[in-house]
């Protein structure tokens, strides 16, 4: 038996996330899978992904497709892990994997592995597999190419554009020959969008008193594609500025996650005459495209044609403050917790 540090949910989030909503505790775990526990793997967690959707799952949800994290239980999210022991025919000791079953703990016993991917290419940072080569990358790829069906020369708007998904949507759109504008919440992030990720333009939404006016300034001819990560008032302003036959990929609504009374969108009627297609999606429905995604992205990473920014905090103990940083927009790029660098 060894000690196993864990981050647990103290209580359901009620309103704004507080660091006291999470707690560090220590338990023990056996380094071998118990007899009779077939089809399981024991893993050492190396990197954990800290994503906004976790905040949604930490509240009481009335959404069958999203399970709430129960108070007293360990947070579970996407992670990169090393297999230490296996009674599952598909996994062997020593293999590196990424997927959605990594506990916010040093070691996790996964009794029913699913949606776990073996890491074959180790010529890139392992942390990329909770970012550009993991769930955020696949989300950007599926949302932009499968949901938005882009055409060369179209105009694209991305919110939370400096985040784990948005920075990739913008780069994919530029690769495809689109005109891309992003919004973010600081001057540093706006500079990053324009000078590192290659967006055509960007603006700080916190400095805009009227989103509708800001969008008309950046898209005088209207918006063809909107990749929505924030929802709320920005979504309403975007609908006002969408072109006929526009497409909206609803990836997230981070502005609404902790509101006791979510904001309504009051102009949905405009979807009809503008013939706008607005579609929500979850990335797990598109994991069958992962090999195709890797074929496109891996060479471009190695050639420097796609870049990715991470915000890595060290140690499991840093996870609560890292999540709080994501909640208030303090992170720059994909927020990752390095539990162990081996």
Swiss-Prot record:
Q: Where does NADP(+) bind?
A: 163-166, 189, 205, 229, 251-257, 281-283, 331
> Where is the protein localized?
Cytoplasm
Q: What is its EC number?
A: 1.3.1.81
GO MF term set = (+)-pulegone reductase (NADP+) activity; 2-alkenal reductase [NAD(P)+] activity; NADPH binding
| Coiled-coil regions listed in the entry | none
Q: How does activity depend on pH?
A: Optimum pH is 5.0.
Question: According to the UniProt entry, how is activity regulated?
Answer: Not inhibited by (+)-menthofuran.
Give a Gene Ontology cellular component term annotated to this protein.
cytoplasm
Q: Name one GO biological process term.
A: response to oxidative stress
**Reaction catalysed by this enzyme:** (2R,5R)-isomenthone + NADP(+) = (R)-pulegone + NADPH + H(+); (1R,4S)-menthone + NADP(+) = (R)-pulegone + NADPH + H(+)
Protein keywords = Cytoplasm, NADP, Oxidoreductase
The pathway to which it is assigned is: Secondary metabolite biosynthesis; terpenoid biosynthesis
**Gene3D superfamilies in UniProt:** Medium-chain alcohol dehydrogenases, catalytic domain, NAD(P)-binding Rossmann-like Domain
Q: What does this protein do?
A: Monoterpene synthase that catalyzes the specific reduction of the 4,8-double bond of (+)-pulegone to produce both (-)-menthone and (+)-isomenthone in a 70:30 ratio. Unable to utilize either (-)-isopiperitenone or (+)-cis-isopulegone, or to catalyze the reverse reaction with (-)-menthone or (+)-isomenthone. Has an absolute requirement for NADPH.
Q: Which family does it belong to?
A: Belongs to the NADP-dependent oxidoreductase L4BD family.
Q: Protein name, please?
A: (+)-pulegone reductase
Q: Which organism is it from?
A: Mentha piperita
């Amino acid at each position: 038996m060894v000690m196993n540090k864990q981050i647990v949910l103290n209580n359901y989030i009620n309103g704004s996330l507080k660091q006291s909503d999470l707690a560090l505790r220590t338990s023990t775990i056996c380094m071998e899978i118990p007899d009779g526990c077939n089809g399981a793997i024991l893993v050492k967690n190396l990197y954990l992904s800290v994503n906004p959707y976790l905040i949604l799952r930490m509240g009481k949800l009335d959404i069958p497709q999203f399970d709430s994290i129960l108070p007293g239980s360990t947070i579970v999210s996407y992670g990169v892990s090393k297999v230490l022991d296996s009674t599952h025919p598909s996994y062997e000791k020593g293999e590196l994997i990424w997927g959605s079953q990594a506990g916010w703990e040093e070691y996790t016993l996964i009794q029913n592995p699913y949606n776990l991917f073996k890491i074959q290419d180790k010529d890139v940072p392992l942390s990329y597999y909770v970012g550009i080569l993991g769930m955020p990358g696949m989300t950007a790829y599926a949302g932009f190419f499968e949901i938005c069906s882009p055409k060369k020369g179209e105009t694209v708007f991305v919110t939370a554009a400096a985040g784990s998904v948005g920075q990739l949507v913008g780069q994919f759109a530029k690769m495809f020959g689109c005109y891309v504008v992003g919004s973010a919440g600081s001057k540093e992030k706006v500079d990053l969008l324009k000078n590192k990720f290659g967006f055509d333009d960007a603006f700080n939404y916190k400095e805009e008193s009227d989103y509708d006016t800001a969008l008309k300034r950046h898209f005088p001819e209207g918006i063809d594609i909107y990749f929505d990560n924030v929802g709320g008032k920005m979504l309403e302003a975007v609908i006002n500025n969408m072109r006929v036959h526009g497409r909206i990929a609803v990836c997230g609504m981070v502005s609404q996650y902790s509101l006791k009374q979510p904001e309504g969108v009051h102009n949905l009627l405009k979807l009809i005459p503008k013939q706008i297609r607005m579609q929500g999606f979850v990335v797990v429905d598109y994991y069958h495209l992962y090999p195709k995604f890797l074929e496109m992205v891996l060479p471009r990473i190695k050639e420097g044609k796609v870049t990715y920014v991470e915000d890595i905090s060290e140690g499991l103990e840093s996870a609560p403050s890292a999540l709080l940083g994501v909640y208030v927009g303090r992170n720059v790029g994909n927020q990752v917790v390095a539990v162990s660098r081996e």
